[in-house]
A protein has these predicted regions:
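Active-site substrate-recognition segment that forms the wall
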Residues: 47-50, 55, 59-99, 228-236, ...
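N-terminal Rossmann-like FAD-binding beta1-loop-alpha1 element of flavoenzymes
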Residues: 6-33
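Glycine-rich FAD pyrophosphate-binding loop
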Residues: 26-46
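C-terminal catalytic lobe of FAD-dependent flavoproteins
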Residues: 165, 297, 338-417
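A conserved short coil-to-beta-strand element within the FAD-binding core of flavoproteins
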Residues: 172-180, 222-236
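Rossmann-like flavin
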Residues: 90-212
Length: 417
């Protein structure tokens, strides 16, 4: 029997699931949010803290032979792989490479940008409601360069994105960059200052604030087993620590763990993960980092957080549950110390998260093709935080029958058969 206090069960209390639950609760639905752990404790805890309005091109697989050769030696910071995982990952990587061909990548960017263009405004709306606007900083972020060749290439790209997608930026020479970041070593030749994005100085704090807003509206958060989701007549049932739960509609927003629920229902999405690591540091002396910053040629990211300076790494291609191997963090730390005066580590061990990725670089958002009253919201890769609020609104509109504010067709789960 359906729980009279539950219209919708949302599986997954990362930033995407929380935003889905909050948007549905705002629309008068009785929602229960379910996770095996606490809210925003996995990938949504440790990201780089960017809401990337400039991120109109999803992260593609390189086609440049030189880059492929460098990655093949497995010695870079921005990409690392487990050799033992390559056989399992090969079908995904092949499809990812094909979708990343320049012409195809440009097509996907046009589709992807329709979500990205709303990312800041949708988060602003939820943050205002949740009393969480203080987590959001409007400084933009810096993409910094060590060589004139890379700088000039990316400057031209930024100008194209301005013309095609309306993404604004400032192109900085070394002198201006040194003025706005005086504690960064003078080894850089310029930067792109992306001015439209915003950053978050405590990603988990933002997610928990959204959760509190959801609960103030009457929503419930419980712990439960996503693998127990099953059809119950015309609705759904599952097990939670508080007992059986039934609902008319279910949303799977489990990020890299989506297959825990989807495979049992007969869906085999071509998902893989890009794992990533972070570590916090105290800034040495009176040093201050004013902007989040990507060291482009080296492949790591520094961001000022409430806890300290967060160093995040690039993509690790591995099986989701494989042993942690923070190799990239070890490679990045001495280079980051040379760029900015980092003092001691503030975490006892590196944090690791997993980014859920599809080979065509678009998230999976929409109704399940073979089940009624089942919706999917996962596969956001590097942009779970960026697209969390957008996805929450879009899923809520699809469930309630409102006209969707973004055409959902490109992100349909049905595209994978």
């Amino acid at each position: 029997m359906q729980d009279p206090a539950c219209d919708v069960v949302v599986l997954g209390a990362g930033i995407v699931g929380i935003c889905v639950a909050l948007h549905l609760q705002k629309r008068g639905r009785a929602v229960v949010l379910v996770d095996r752990r606490g809210a925003a404790e996995e990938t949504s805890f440790g990201n780089a803290g960017l809401i990337q309005r400039e991120g109109v091109y999803p992260y593609g697989f390189p086609h440049d032979f030189g880059a492929l050769l460098r990655y093949g030696f497995n010695r870079t910071i921005d990409a690392y792989y487990h050799p033992s995982a390559l056989l399992r990952l090969a079908p995904f990587l092949w499809k990812y490479w094909r979708h990343s061909r320049p012409a195809r990548h440009a097509e996907q960017a046009k589709r992807y940008s329709k979500l990205i263009e709303h990312c800041v405004s949708e988060h602003d709306a939820l943050a205002a409601q949740a009393g969480a606007s203080g987590f959001i900083r409007r400084t933009g972020w810096l993409k910094v360069f060590r060589t004139a060749r890379e700088r000039d290439k990316r400057f031209a790209e930024a100008e194209r994105w301005r013309e095609e997608f309306g993404v604004r930026s400032r192109l900085l020479d070394a002198g201006v960059l040194q003025e706005i970041e005086p504690h960064v070593a003078p080894v850089l030749v310029g930067a792109i200052h992306w001015t439209d994005p915003v950053s978050v100085d405590d990603p988990q704090g933002l997610g928990l604030s959204y959760l509190c807003a959801f609960e103030r509206l009457g929503g419930r958060f419980v712990q439960g087993n996503a693998a127990s989701l099953a059809i119950d007549g015309s609705g759904w049932r599952m097990r939670t620590v508080q007992g059986p739960l039934a609902a008319s509609t279910a949303v799977i927003a489990l990020g890299p763990w989506a297959d825990v629920a989807t495979r049992a229902l007969g869906y085999d999405f071509p998902l893989a993960v890009k794992r990533g690591y972070h570590m916090h540091y105290r800034a040495a002396g009176e040093a201050r980092l004013n902007f989040p910053m990507l060291d482009t040629e080296r492949g790591y990211f520094l961001a000022p957080m409430r806890r300290g300076i967060r160093l995040t790494t690039g993509a690790e291609f591995a099986l989701r549950d494989a042993i942690r191997t923070p190799v990239q963090l070890g490679r990045a730390e001495p280079i980051a110390r040379d760029l900015f005066p980092l003092a001691e580590r503030l975490d006892t061990e590196p944090w690791m998260g997993a980014r859920p990725c599809t080979p065509d670089m678009l998230p999976v958002i929409g109704p399940a093709p073979r089940h009624k009253n089942l919706f999917f919201a996962f596969g956001h890769a590097h942009h779970g935080l960026t697209l969390g609020a957008v996805t929450g609104r879009l899923i809520a509109e699809l469930i309630t029958g409102e006209p969707p504010f973004v055409d959902p067709a490109p992100y349909s789960p049905g595209r994978f058969g």
